[in-house]
A protein has these predicted regions:
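Structural signature of tandem-repeat unit edges
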Residues: 2-12, 19-43, 55-125, 135-148, ...
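A short, well-ordered alpha-helical element
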Residues: 45-53
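Residue-level signature of the C-terminal ends
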Residues: 53, 266, 271, 300, ...
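Repeat-mediated protein-protein interaction surfaces in helical alpha-solenoids
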Residues: 265-282, 304-309
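Ankyrin repeat arrays, specifically the small/polar loop and inter-repeat linker segments at the C-terminal end
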Residues: 275-289, 314-321, 334, 344-359
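Ankyrin repeat A-helix N-terminal signature
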Residues: 296-302, 326-332
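Ankyrin repeat structural motif
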Residues: 302-310, 332-341
């Protein structure tokens, strides 16, 4: 992986471009400064950083280029337009390390090639259109730091499904800024480093904005869908779970029923600060929509999710029949076996009707 870095005032750095051959990128938190001057923490992603057609990139005389070696160490190869790698590009010593690639030989990690990004803990700013037209970006991982977002950061990122926050739900994070930049449905997972499972899973449904001008030249700004309201449940960049859960009983007819079913499922699956009243409301909706959840879980081949759904004990005979049909359609024998086993155990645990024998 090769990084183009723009030094900033205050001893920090902005990442302006990434090159490599892997669609899943884990960005470093800092790079070594030239001439042994310590390290530059990466605090910003530049405008159009991962866009296929970047605009306004700084010239080579303003940036430093780093290459990640096989041992993971970042090595400075070019500083402000000057090659500092110490390698000759044209050499007949075939045992010598290869010289740095020229710009026209580099493969940018951008656009439809990019699938996953892990942001460093040091990051504080994401520039405008950073992920513009990254149509296959499906997961973004961020740390505990608060974030400032530019405009249209995730424009046309239609495949983005998960925001993984490496923090506890009680901590102040950049989630408020992230979901505020996404109008499509997206899930946030609070998943601290080193833990086997998330602490909380929260869905943010899609919403639409409408601006209408009346004959009196008054602008009416309206929102369709509850997604906008879910995105406001933060205070000082900390999640407000009670306010989040209070939105569901207010109605969700304008929202995608499958997304709302997943919202209920994930809140019950990881019930962080979930009140009894909210739990009952989520269970009631989930009982009549288990098929929607199973459809998504089977498509993702999420066996652990199927097990979690069965553990909630919200499926009746009709739901099991629907689930068996969905598993057969998906050709998922493991899920079909799990459903059959859960149904058998539920029937065996049910109280048996009394029988009367008149054979004296």
């Amino acid at each position: 992986m090769i990084l183009d870095i723009l030094p900033l005032a205050g001893g920090t750095a902005r990442l302006v471009r990434v090159y490599g051959g892997e669609p899943c990128v884990k960005l470093p938190g800092a790079v070594p400064a030239p001439e042994g001057e310590g390290e530059w923490p990466i605090t910003e992603l530049g405008d159009y950083c991962f866009s296929e057609k970047p605009r306004g990139l700084p010239g080579p005389e303003k940036i430093c280029r780093y290459e990640r070696a096989e041992d993971g160490k970042l090595c400075l190869t070019r500083a402000f337009g000057r090659d500092v790698s110490g390698k000759e590009r044209y050499s007949f010593d075939f045992d010598a390390p290869a010289a740095p690639a020229q710009d026209d030989e580099l493969h940018p990690i951008c656009g439809n090639f990019l699938e996953e990004v892990t942001l460093p803990e040091s990051l504080r700013v994401i520039g405008s259109c950073t992920f513009y037209n990254c149509r296959r970006l499906r997961r973004l991982t961020a740390g505990t730091g608060e974030l400032t977002m530019g405009s249209d950061v995730f424009l046309n990122c239609f495949a983005l499904e998960d925001l993984v926050i490496r923090a506890t739900p009680e901590q102040a994070t950049g989630l408020f800024a992230l979901v505020g930049s996404i109008t499509e449905a997206v899930r946030a997972l609070f998943w601290p480093v080193g833990e086997a499972a998330p602490r909380a899973g929260l869905w943010y449904p899609a919403y639409w904005e409408d601006i209408e001008e009346t004959p009196a030249h008054i602008l009416l700004h309206t929102f369709s869908g509850q997604g906008y309201h879910y995105r406001q449940c933060f205070l000082e960049n900390k999640l407000l779970p009670a306010e989040y859960d209070a939105i569901f009983p207010q109605g969700h007819d304008a929202d995608d029923a499958s997304v709302m079913a997943m919202l209920c499922f994930d809140r019950l699956r990881w019930p962080w600060q979930l009140s009894d009243a909210a739990r009952d409301a989520y269970r009631d909706f989930l009982k009549t929509n288990t098929g929607r959840v199973l459809t998504r879980l089977l498509k993702a081949q999420d066996t652990e999710g199927v097990k979690a759904l069965l553990a909630l004990d919200v499926m009746d005979a009709d739901a099991f029949a629907e689930g068996a049909a969905l598993a057969a359609k998906a050709d998922n024998a493991e899920a079909a076996a799990l459903l059959a086993d859960a149904e058998h155990k539920k029937r065996a645990a049910a109280p048996q009707k009394k029988r009367y024998d008149f054979d004296f």
